[in-house]
């Protein structure tokens, strides 16, 4: 049986090797990103690595500070490298993100980065079934019921995300999340454009043409893929010694 936690850790540790002193680094949100933050923190303590980090959520910021990583709230300079997880990866490197509720900040940080690397376990690359993971859409609370109905005009099975108390999940930006159960996404570029044309939609959890590399953790190590115009191309297979 696959050890998905080990796979996440292997992907995160390998991607962390690309972080160098002097960089401004975007840090993602989610379980795989937390392995990354712990590994960067280890390098800060043991190797004297010096970076500044832009964090995509309060949870990420808290963990980064606990690991001794310098956190900045923003920068006018371009971020050198962002490393983040993904809920699903499609054939041409399109991502579904936002399962952790941080998609708006994640997209702002990724868009303003020279490069974005994605760290995932072996379940996340779904070229043939892209869209089987629910697509998160961040919406403003005002008139949110109407916004949901407008989203249902595109996908009838669209639900408002709730927290453990049965109340609407609230993002760090004070917004709500709608989860769209698309089943299959054939044209992510036009889908994103259509969704963002709906008033009340803040951001969509589709990342088109942003990621440059994918680190797919395995039980033995990590597969590294580059994203090209023709699709995902395997660069390297790394085995954990």
Curated annotation (Swiss-Prot):
One Pfam family, short name: Rib_5-P_isom_A
GO molecular function terms attached to this record: ribose-5-phosphate isomerase activity
GO terms of biological process kind: D-ribose metabolic process; pentose-phosphate shunt, non-oxidative branch
Record keywords: Isomerase
Known pathway: Carbohydrate degradation; pentose phosphate pathway; D-ribose 5-phosphate from D-ribulose 5-phosphate (non-oxidative stage): step 1/1
Catalytic activity: aldehydo-D-ribose 5-phosphate = D-ribulose 5-phosphate
GO cellular component: cytosol
Function: Catalyzes the reversible conversion of ribose-5-phosphate to ribulose 5-phosphate.
Subunit structure: Homodimer.
Name assigned to this protein: Ribose-5-phosphate isomerase A
GN (gene name): rpiA
